[in-house]
Amino acid sequence: MLEKEYSFALYDRVDQLPAAWDELAAANIFLSCGYLSVLETSAPQNMECHFIGVFDGSELVAAALSQFLDLNSLESFGERDRCIKTSVRNFVFKRFSSHVMFIGNNMLTGQNAFVSGKTADYSSVLFALKAASVTLASQYRKRGKPIHLVTFKDFSESKADRFKTAGFSDYFQFSTQPNMVLEIRPDWNSFDDYIASLLKKYRDQFKRARKKSDGLEKRKMHLEDILQHEKTINELYHHVARNAPFNTFFLAENHFRTLKEKLGGNFLFYGYFDDGKLVGFSTLIKNGDVLDTYFLGYDESVQREKMLYLNMLYDMIAFGINKGFREIVFARTALEIKSSVGAQPVEMIGFMKHRNRLINKKLDRVFDYLEPKTEWQQRHPFK
């Protein structure tokens, strides 16, 4: 039984949002007007974003993000792992799930679907968001773009019961790769303290990586630098993105520039140069006392020779410790190497529903085939 009955309103533009939106979204930069305006002006080409306000009477009690993805307009899901199973998976997505609606942010890992006020009832908010997703699906159907799959993504396992209360019994509960998170220990007052806390094997890994990176120059890049190197930045990003086993979007060319314009000092861009040439970059977003890693790119030959990716991880940790962050969110993928620097897996759950009733009943089998469990060995690098 729901405690409250909330209403909702849909918005297509940031300038339409209620005045109280940013006050509510202060707990999560990824739901702030600043970040949402980035999505409004530089979302991936196959993505449309909508914003949802949940109200108790006239009071805004929750602020949410919805994303529509059209997988038909994507040139490639990814160019790695060319095999029959991958081809079948890609066919199934295009044929049966090409129009996907997310309540949440498909570009991030973690609970970035909505933020709610302290007095808001969680299950009642979910119920209102479910109703909003039905209305959005109806709007897309009238536009000739029927929604095949609705997904509420990246919630902590402790919230599963709240979804049941909110009437998600016909949704399939799923989990994919965990979110890799490094908790900053209170006794790490400097990066040297972090290194000292590592077992010898992992201290040696750090020393080897730093030795390999000899000759690389790391630079903090400002807006004018990002603009100057934008072509190379996009090439480096696409090299990494297209070599991923599966993609549902590719970033817009102006995405990093727009992030810097809208978020200012909360968006950090670091370039890695070899003999004056940009060969890699990493990005970070400050989210209160949490440091979120964002997208990166690199030249594969330099990455192998210089252990560039591992060095980026160490640099992110050094920044997080030196600036007093509580934790660093390393997100999904590359689970083993992230665990080798101390990140711990945090299981996330989601809920999905297919518009075809027969397919919806079989989602558990379909999901296990299309999203096989990742086999990896967790590392334990600390003393």
Where are these regions (language model features)?
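Glycine-rich loops and low-complexity Gly/Arg-rich segments
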Residues: 32-35, 77-79, 87-92, 139-140, ...
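A conserved beta-strand-loop-helix scaffold within acyl/acetyltransferase catalytic domains
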Residues: 3-82, 148-304
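Active-site/acyl-donor-binding loops of N-acyltransferases
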Residues: 2-5, 68-69, 111, 166-193, ...
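Acyl-donor binding region in acyl/amide transferases
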Residues: 48, 71-170, 290-350
